[in-house]
Amino acid sequence: MIRLDHVTFGYGLQKKVLRDVSLEIPEGGRLCLTGPSGEGKTTVLRLLLGLEKPRRGTVSVPEGTAFSAVFQEDRLLPWKTALENVALFSDGETARRCLAALGLSDSLDAMPDTLSGGMKRRVALARALAHPFDVLVLDEALTGLDGGTKTQCLAAIDQAVGHRTLVMATHDESEAAALGAEIHYI
């Protein structure tokens, strides 16, 4: 069980982004954070990943939990091909399979600067899906994808997650519905 218990957080002297937030995510659960921009969805994900520390409250994650994540920025290594970017955290066969599941079989040897924005998003997603994980964290991972590509990606995410845990932030509640995720408004 992953827990946020009465968490309060703010950046620097800025107003509090999160105020007394409590969440429980059971092992194998699927949770979607949604709400207006700037209300703390990404911050909750960063707290779960240990990238930020709360001002007050506690974040509890079982020891040894392996995370894999896709952030709003794709962060591909520009000197590596699509396949090499995905294979950083997996074997070549798993990387190929994940890229194929996301419709990128023809782009294995492409360099990031030759890929469209949507293709870069899918390479970043393939990298996260190929990495061994207990919890998959997606921060607006499907933003900017067309409807057909988004549907293909949702199917790949659903299959890859299986009975493991998914925590995602999105403005598109249909993504949560497609993945059977409980919706939590922030």
Task: State what each model feature region is.
Residues 49:
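Helix-to-loop junction immediately C-terminal to a conserved catalytic motif
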Residues 80-94:
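Q-loop/switch helix immediately C-terminal to the Walker
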Residues 93-107:
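Conserved ABC ATPase "signature" region
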Residues 111, 140-141:
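Walker B catalytic motif
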Residues 111-115, 119:
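Conserved ABC ATPase signature
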Residues 125:
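Hydrophobic anchor residue at the start of the ABC signature
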Residues 147-148:
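Helix N-cap at the start of a conserved alpha-helix in ABC-type nucleotide-binding domains
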